């Protein structure tokens, strides 16, 4: 459960990420595909090379979903409901991949904003990413 402090911390991160969200989304995917090659299996039709237009486009979607969740932090389930349906019913992505994506997003934020990611903010952002992963897999059951 996200505390009031967690919510403030998460909103602060997304305020800083701001205009770079799309680039961070693409970088997050590139890191995930490199560090966890098994995640590539869901993207057999993608050009997975650095700077690929497909990774950039999907990174934009990932970033938009995270921003949407942060903007509706009191109703993450509602904000991600359609995306949860898509991943559970059509795409059938292994739920562990959302945790891997969350970890890679934390790394990207840490690289670009090292002073922002204090231990407290890190914990809050990790809890937020876990909440996002939980909602994206909620309809698998």
Curated annotation (Swiss-Prot):
Gene3D superfamilies linked to this entry: Globins
Residues annotated to bind heme b: 87
Tissue specificity remark: Red blood cells.
Single biological process term from Gene Ontology: hydrogen peroxide catabolic process
Keywords, alphabetical: Heme, Iron, Metal-binding, Oxygen transport, Transport
CDD domains xref list: Hb-alpha-like
GO CC annotation terms, alphabetical: blood microparticle; haptoglobin-hemoglobin complex; hemoglobin complex
Binding site for O2: 58
Domain Globin: 1-141
GO molecular function terms listed in the Swiss-Prot or TrEMBL record: haptoglobin binding; heme binding; iron ion binding; organic acid binding; oxygen binding; oxygen carrier activity; peroxidase activity
InterPro entries, per database record: Globin, Globin-like_sf, Globin/Proto, Hemoglobin_a-typ, Hemoglobin_oxygen_transport, Hemoglobin_pi
Keyword field contains Membrane: no
Keyword Transport among UniProt keywords: yes
Family statement drawn from the similarity comment of this UniProt entry: Belongs to the globin family.
Subunit structure: Heterotetramer of two alpha chains and two beta chains.
Function in brief: Involved in oxygen transport from the lung to the various peripheral tissues.
Protein name per UniProt: Hemoglobin subunit alpha-A
Organism whose genome encodes this protein: Phalacrocorax carbo
Gene: HBAA
